[in-house]
């Protein structure tokens, strides 16, 4: 359910070092489909940039520049295994057909360092904009960023959607608590897709 130019192995990393820089990766689909998420493999090759925000962005065109989706306050995430992708779920369903571009808009000049496959050349599909003009990448290779399509990106687990069940508070652990940015959940429960709501309390 994904499209890829890379082979899943990063030999290097690719990044832009300009505040407000944009990176766009061109894909083309022949039939109408629903974009659900974007997989990105960020490589920690230099400094930790997991607190650097970017706008996850989808374009339908770069000339003229037409943004059809943008999701703010995203940060690079380093997965705990070699060459593993992190899935950025879209907040809304996005129906696409034909040519589109996925990528990001930076909010700082820090290089985010996406994994770069040097064995497959997709430079003709990769564009960047650091000074107001979109340019084609001149570096041979493929960034490790993939669009995910379909009705759902989660496998069916055989649970009736009307079935209810109770998770005891001892079934999971949330840490760290408190936190101002990221948190993690570990659970022994067989149901691994959860909904997290927001509760604001003022004293």
Segments predicted by a language model, with ranges:
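Short, surface-exposed beta-strand/loop patches at domain edges
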Residues: 105-156
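C-terminal outer-membrane/trafficking sorting elements
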Residues: 54-60, 163-203
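A short beta-strand element within beta-rich, extracytoplasmic domains
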Residues: 33-46, 104
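Contiguous beta-strand segments within globular domains
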Residues: 22-24, 33-39, 180-184
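Short beta-strands within extracellular/lumenal beta-sheet-rich domains
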Residues: 16-29, 85-86
């Amino acid at each position: 359910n994904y499209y890829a130019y890379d082979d899943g192995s990063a030999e290097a990393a690719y990044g832009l070092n300009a505040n407000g820089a944009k990176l766009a990766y061109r894909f083309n689909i022949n039939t109408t489909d629903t974009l659900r998420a974007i997989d990105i493999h960020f490589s920690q090759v230099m400094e930790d940039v997991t607190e650097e925000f970017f706008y996850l962005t989808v374009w339908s065109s770069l000339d003229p520049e037409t943004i059809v989706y943008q999701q703010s306050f995203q940060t690079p995430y380093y997965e705990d295994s070699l060459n593993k992708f992190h899935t950025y779920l879209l907040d809304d369903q996005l129906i696409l057909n034909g040519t589109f571009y996925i990528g990001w808009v930076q909010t700082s000049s820090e290089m985010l360092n996406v994994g770069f496959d040097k064995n497959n050349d997709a430079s003709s599909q990769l564009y960047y904009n650091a000074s107001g003009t979109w340019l084609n990448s001149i570096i041979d290779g493929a960034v490790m960023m993939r669009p995910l399509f379909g009705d759902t990106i989660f496998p069916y687990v055989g649970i009736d959607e009307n079935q209810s069940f109770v998770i005891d508070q001892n079934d999971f652990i949330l840490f760290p608590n408190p936190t101002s940015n990221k948190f993690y959940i570990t659970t022994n429960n067989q149901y691994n897709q959860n909904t997290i709501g927001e509760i604001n309390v003022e004293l």
